[in-house]
Amino acid sequence: MSKEKNKNEVFGKEDVLSVSGDYGIVNQIEFQGRSFAGASVAPYGIVDTGDIVYTKSPLKSNPYGIIKVNKGKAGIVSTLYAVYKPLDNVCSDFVQIYFEQDARMNNYMHPLVNKGAKNDMKVSDVNALKGEVCFPSKDEQIKISEHFANLDHLITLHQRKCEQLKELKKFMLQNMFPKKG
């Protein structure tokens, strides 16, 4: 677990990161249009590229929170997040892939988390790591991670192509059936 804090305020409010279920770790201002940081960001945790972040915020599919890896630039997160440095025998991208399946994440966290009266998570940052997982060798983790990264890239390319085809269809329909007037 990382205890590295932004004590010297190397990072400012423009560097605050959030964790999104769909988009991973994102810059708060770029993603949400503004920073939700408090008056001081000195107690915020520093997140380097490759660090693993656990958010206790419940999501519809993940009532015990989610785990994501910072694939972007370094920044800071609220004290509500737990930040972990990957061990030498762990590929952080594999950790995210492993926990992306909702059922696996929920089954891992369920025995570790107690929900409070206000539906808040009662699990310490250290206890969030007490569940057992069985990972392959680091070389195998890297190969699996690269395979899924290639699939994600392919999906992105197909999504772009689909959007371009929709635009082409729209253009063709407008030209086939011009507005009268």
Predicted feature residues:
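Feature detects amphipathic, helix-rich regulatory segments
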Residues: 1-181
